[in-house]
Amino acid sequence: MFKKVENKANFPKIEEKILKFWNDNKIFEKSIKQREGCEEFTFYDGPPFATGLPHFGHFVPNTIKDIIPRYQTMQGKYVKRNFGWDTHGLPVEYEVEKKLGISGKYEIENYGIENFNKECRKIVLRYTEEWKNIILRLGRWVDFEKGYKTMDISFMESVWWVFKNLYEKGLIYESYYVLPYSPKLATPLSNFEVNLGEYKEVNDPSLTIKFKIKDKNEYLLVWTTTPWTLPSNLGIAVGQEIEYSKIFDKTKEEILILGSKKLNSYYDDENSYTIIEKFKGSKLEGIEYEPIFNYFLEQKDKGAFKVHTADYVTTDDGTGIVHIAPFGEEDYKILKKHTNVDIIDPLDAECKFTNQVKDFKGLFVKDADKKIIENLKLRNFLFKRENYLHRYPFCYRTNCPIIYRPISSWFVNVEKIKTKLLEVNEKINWMPAHLKKGRFGKWLENAKDWAISRNRFWGNPIPIWICSKTGKKICIGSKKELENLSGQKIEDLHKDQIDKITWPSKDGGKFIRTSEVLDCWFESGAMPYASNHYPFTNEINFKNIFPADFIAEGLDQTRGWFYTLTILGTALFENTAFKNVIVNGLVLSSDGRKMSKSFKNYTDPMQVINTFGADALRLYLIMSPVVKADDLKYSDNGVRDVLKNIIIPIWNAYSFFTTYAIIDKFKPPKNISLAKNNNLDKWIISELESLKKILNTEIDKYNLTKSIESLLEFIDKLNNWYIRRSRRRFWKSENDKDKNDAYETLYYAIKTLMILLAPFIPFITEEIYQNLKTDEDKQSIHLNDYPKANENFINKTIEEKINLARKITSMARSLRSLHNIKIRMPISTIYIVTKNQNEQNMLMEMQEIILDEINAKEMKIKANEEELITYKAKANFKELGKKLGKDMKAVSAEISKLKNEDIIKIINGTSYEIKVANAKHYLSLNDIILEREEKENLKVINEESITIGIDSLITKELYLEGLTREFVRQIQNLRKEKNFDVSDRINLYIENSETLKEMLNKFEKYIKTETLALNIILNKSKLEKKINLADDIFTLIGIEKC
């Protein structure tokens, strides 16, 4: 019936074999096909870029995205799993620029947009084969053949449909606005893209500049940390309610104005200046000043070069007076509100000064700082120069500093739908739950309009054509619509082709497409519709594709894909795009840093899989805090520990069963009866049915942490209690009903456990299932239904009894370990203290098991601790300090003198009176801190409401029994070393020793039974191994098969 199982398994090799089995038999395809026509479970796969190889950070969501669809398929749902590729956008273009050795917009245009896009098309799927091989080797079942690519014409057309829908709802607009801008990419970025990058500590120049008030010999001291913005200065801002001082600087002999609170920051000596006047900032409003550069003097007639009040001005840094240029969001708003100035931007696409600022033309803005400072110093405008250490954003793609600048862009009006976004978020089940109101909810509350246009080349073109004469706009929502308007056949929708499509306007002009392409995040957010070519594919039932039942990605996607899905789902349908989401944290290297090839701070993921197996890696990741959106410091040792502590014990349980089942020719019946007589069988069956109930509940709630914890608890119970306590039932020679029940129970437990574990560790479960399955079973474990609990066999009473016995055993073993008393050394007595009558009754029923487990001769159950310990007490200062005041010290001294019997009274609820001077104080249990002192020879441990004690006095008889148990263990080890079969009978050879003689006199039968020794023979020539029975007791033994 069963194949022989090797004790030591090569798990990576087994996994390779299982992969071949799945492929050869098309098991994945069968798992989906058998659910056709069933209820559909919709799953969206967030598209990765294929320009880099997958790493541990990808393995976490890919494991989660395998577990849930496998589980839902086993629950009878039809789950399509099509892989997707993000093929457009900055990551691809940046890779191509590096490959071609070009950089920036101008060089790309010189190279030719069509040529550039051809290179993008070539490189975009560079690593798809590697991705496919690695993801499949991880054990993830996903359809790469039916996958989607964002550069597919069908996908791009659906994105146009999404865009037009938003446009017609008034949610798309074009405007100038100050946006984060990447100089190297020559394009604006969205706010959430900025958050995907890194904020670095930078040391920028901090300048205090003198601005002369018009027609007066007085100066405003203005502070800035961006010297490069000074040539574009159009205003000055002060705080309306901030107090300012007009002073006479005795050294410089100048009249200066600055915030009163900042005088000490600028002057060490109060005698170096005289205060002329103090006033609120409102008094400065409207004052004109002389510009420090003359590049934009024409803006004076439009309201430039005046002082304005602004709420954002403070005296935390600088002077309490700041300069205004259209390179900051707040500055931009003030200029728009109070002036009619043109929004000047004297920078080219790479953030170098243009001819408008001729003195610094061609200089990158950050490089221009030094020359601007020199210029101001030369012309006596520089009052003070310092350095300012602060955090500054860097581009997440190029690692260059982001520049904020006014730029024309297309936006989604997120502000308009913000209330609805928050309502939609309430419908989503977030795992972990805190993200709903926390990171994601807060991001939605503060959401700004989304800049969706990019001044780039390889992307989905914004489908708006503008009349060259009137500026009239036409938004296109499909390929056919464009063909009808232009009269031209459309084969490709990319910029290099689509920009050739124009047509005449009735007004005499020509319709030309706006030059920008869409942010690739817009495409990702449109994935639910575009991956299905919705609404152009008629056969699609929309409710089957929207909203998704489930998605999963990393924490960074709260400001990326989760966000864009939510915006577009809300804007289009006023609904969430996904119902349930599992969010994972970051996987860092063991030193807590980001994993990096240049740092060489992590092992190649495929090497880890080939060493420990994908199951061990999957389990390691899913068991970790990373599943709860926390960071994980990855360690190879962690994967090794999972293999050692979980995978191998599962294998050992399976190996144990098959070994004895083969010996006894056990054949499982078609229908195993779960009605058993043995309490151990009843218990493990009950635990298994309870586990089924927990898993069906928790995985349905997407709580993988609780699910894994419950599975691991059961594996421990099965291995370390059920199998260990049932061994003798399998060992005995007679094949009675009890032995058969043990086989049936263990077979049922292991096989069912494998099906429960299958979504989590698909390889080892398949391997074990293939050896355990009967002719009536499914071809693969993954074609089974997920097991449902049989409530009739859940017996909470027996679970409580055995789990109490397990708890007592665990406490006793800890106590032994603490005092170096080996488990094989018998003890005379265990004392168990519990006031709970029900627990006392259960303990009496479990007495035989507990004594056997902890190797004790007698068990005594007590209702209180007095027989085991004496008490001492200390004052609880936290409690008493509130009410005793000056008597505290004296009362504390009296508490330390309390006798054991007084403390017992307090424990039993009697209020105890202490007199200090003329005052009386009454003590309760909360007022004291208990200290326990063990009575002679007793070792005591307390856990919650239970205290146990063991008698540590080892008599000569107990000692001899302990040596005998160790002797048996050493013989069993030698059997394993010599690869004896578990059923092999042996001759045991010993040397002449007084200790062995004593042991044989008392325990010969026990030794023979345990070791399957038919004869114990004195024979020096057969001795082969020296063994250590105790610290200084050694002997020689030998064994051979009979």
UniProtKB/Swiss-Prot annotation:
Keywords: Aminoacyl-tRNA synthetase, ATP-binding, Cytoplasm, Ligase, Metal-binding, Nucleotide-binding, Protein biosynthesis, Zinc. One of its GO terms (biological process) is isoleucyl-tRNA aminoacylation. ATP binds at K597. SUPFAM superfamilies: Anticodon-binding domain of a subclass of class I aminoacyl-tRNA synthetases (SSF47323), Nucleotidylyl transferase (SSF52374), ValRS/IleRS/LeuRS editing domain (SSF50677). One of its GO terms (cellular component) is cytoplasm. A motif ('KMSKS' region) lies at residues 594-598. Its cofactor is Zn(2+). It holds the Pfam family Anticodon_1. Its EC number is 6.1.1.5. It catalyses: tRNA(Ile) + L-isoleucine + ATP = L-isoleucyl-tRNA(Ile) + AMP + diphosphate. Gene3D superfamilies: HUPs (3.40.50.620), Isoleucyl-tRNA Synthetase, Domain 1 (1.10.730.10). It is found in: Cytoplasm. It comes from the Bacteria. The keyword DNA damage does not apply. Catalyzes the attachment of isoleucine to tRNA(Ile). As IleRS can inadvertently accommodate and process structurally similar amino acids such as valine, to avoid such errors it has two additional distinct tRNA(Ile)-dependent editing activities. One activity is designated as 'pretransfer' editing and involves the hydrolysis of activated Val-AMP. The other activity is designated 'posttransfer' editing and involves deacylation of mischarged Val-tRNA(Ile). IleRS has two distinct active sites: one for aminoacylation and one for editing. The misactivated valine is translocated from the active site to the editing site, which sterically excludes the correctly activated isoleucine. The single editing site contains two valyl binding pockets, one specific for each substrate (Val-AMP or Val-tRNA(Ile)). Belongs to the class-I aminoacyl-tRNA synthetase family. IleS type 2 subfamily. This is Isoleucine--tRNA ligase.
